[in-house]
Regions:
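Short gly/ser/thr-rich secondary-structure transition/capping motifs
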Residues: 43, 60-64, 151-156
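Ferredoxin-reductase
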Residues: 1-57, 112-114, 139-143
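A short, basic/flexible loop-to-alpha-helix module at the beginning of a structural domain
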Residues: 63-75
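A phosphate-binding catalytic loop at a beta-strand-loop-alpha-helix junction
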Residues: 78-93
């Protein structure tokens, strides 16, 4: 069993590739590890996973690492900011916070260049609609016809929405 805290990451050794760090994207309460991996031009590990990884191939996982994990005893409001695949550790934090029934306000900001770069948006919409303490704020730089997605920078949206950050815990990834 690989034990970790929501928000942490692991070091993966895959094939003959150089080790690579990826954040867990699921709750620590499962018997699985979920990683979100974007295929990058020239990305040795991501391209190996996409094109060459075989079913049953051994992947060595070391860790966990990182201090940006959910502080379960914090009772004040939380801000979770993600960009790109930085959504992975934020999803881990959000999922676990709901499992342990944290009730304080949790404001999720998810930024990207375009609407096409946003992923898991339906899952986040569903989670926030069924949990009154969660608020989901997708923000993109490019214009969109989708009125539920704000245009601009995620940092500007955050400042527009919250004028006093006293007492907040913030988790940022991406």
């Amino acid at each position: 069993i690989f034990e970790f805290k929501a928000g942490q990451y692991a070091e993966l050794f895959i094939g003959d590739c150089k080790e690579k760090h990826f954040s867990m994207a699921n709750s620590p309460n499962t018997n699985e590890l979920e990683f979100h991996i974007k295929t990058l031009d020239g990305g040795e590990v991501s391209n190996y996973i996409k094109n060459d990884l075989k079913l049953g191939e051994i992947i060595t996982v070391k860790g966990p690492y990182g201090n940006a994990y959910l502080r379960e005893k914090h009772k004040g409001p939380i801000i979770a900011v993600a960009g790109g695949t930085g959504l992975a550790p934020i999803l881990s934090i959000i999922e676990y916070s709901q499992e342990i029934e944290m009730k304080q306000p949790i404001n999720i900001y998810y930024g990207a260049q375009s609407e096409q770069e946003l992923y898991f948006i339906e899952k986040l919409d569903m989670i926030t609609k069924t949990n009154n303490n969660l608020k989901f704020n997708p923000v993109i730089i490019e214009k969109s016809k989708n009125k539920s997605i704000r245009q601009g920078l995620v940092t500007d949206a955050l400042i527009e929405d919250i004028n006093d950050f006293d007492g907040y815990k913030a988790y940022l990834a991406g």
